[in-house]
């Protein structure tokens, strides 16, 4: 009985020491990857006057809906997302400009098309 109590005390002491050591380990106070990226983006936006662009570009998007499984973007535009009828969530993008709905029965397909001009 005395040996068991001694082991129990030693085990508890060891667990307490390990817990205290974990508390003493330095923690990264810089933050998460998300906060670091956010900080860098803010820095770049704050300094954008240092690097003025001579070209002004606009980002425009439109949705193209077609019957069947395929919906294609107009020339010069790229697919950024797809939606399919009958609650089908299985689709892929072909050649960068066409949405292909993969479900067996399909009544419509929509392609979200964007361009930077």
Swiss-Prot record:
Gene3D superfamilies: Resistin head domain
Signal peptide segment: 1-29
Positions of disulphide bridges: 61-114, 73-113, 82-99, 84-101, 88-103
Tissue-specific expression: Expressed in colon, lung, spleen, pancreas, ileum and bone marrow (at protein level). In colon, found throughout the crypt and surface epithelium, including goblet cells (at protein level). Highest expression is observed in bone marrow, spleen and lung, with lower levels in other tissues. Detected at low levels in granulocytes, but not found in monocytes or lymphocytes. Has very weak expression in white adipose tissue.
InterPro entries given in the database record: RELM (IPR009714), Resistin-like_sf (IPR036262)
Origin: domain of life: Eukaryota
Pfam family, one: Resistin
Keywords: Disulfide bond, Hormone, Secreted, Signal
Biological process according to GO: myeloid dendritic cell chemotaxis
Subcellular compartments: Secreted
Gene Ontology molecular function, alphabetical: hormone activity
GO cellular component, as recorded: extracellular space
Induction field: Up-regulated in colon and bone marrow in response to a high-fat diet. Also up-regulated in obese mice mutant for the leptin receptor LEPR (db/db genotype).
Function summary: Probable hormone. Promotes chemotaxis in myeloid cells.
Family: Belongs to the resistin/FIZZ family.
Subunit structure: Homodimer. Heterodimer with RETNLB.
This protein's name: Resistin-like gamma
